[in-house]
């Protein structure tokens, strides 16, 4: 079976991906912001702290993953953030927009770059 890394695996789609893949026998490495708040546990799932908005957190996550497995078959960059409200132009907070952009756009780039050597395997 394959080794999958899923970011944002503590709830929603990320958690459901993890559950479905675990049921098929895959190994999951879950990146979550708050591992202590994780309600779901499974013997084939390794959970590490990960804040995709933080380069330091991503580097630590990558080191933890590298200490657990020699390669990754699939990376699912699922972690994301949204404000959750519709706003007029006058109401949009530029700082919040930068944070959302950082998490949703730069975050997956950080994670992909940090885990790239493991995704390459023996290639």
Describe the function of each predicted region.
Residues 78-85:
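Conserved NAD(P)H cofactor-binding loop of Rossmann-fold oxidoreductase domains
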Residues 71-72, 119-123:
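Active-site loop of short-chain dehydrogenase/reductase
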């Amino acid at each position: 079976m394959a080794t999958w890394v899923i970011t944002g695996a503590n709830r929603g789609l990320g958690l459901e991906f993890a559950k479905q893949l675990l049921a098929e026998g895959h190994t999951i490495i879950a990146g979550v912001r708050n591992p202590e708040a994780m309600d779901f546990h499974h013997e084939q799932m390794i959970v590490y702290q990960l804040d995709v908005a933080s380069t330091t957190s991503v580097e630590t996550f990558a080191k933890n993953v590298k200490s657990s497995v020699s390669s990754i078959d699939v990376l699912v960059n699922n972690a994301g953030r949204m404000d959750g409200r519709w706003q007029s132009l006058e109401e949009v907070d530029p700082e919040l927009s930068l944070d959302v952009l950082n998490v949703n756009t730069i975050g997956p780039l950080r994670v992909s770059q940090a885990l790239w050597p493991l995704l390459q395997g023996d290639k």
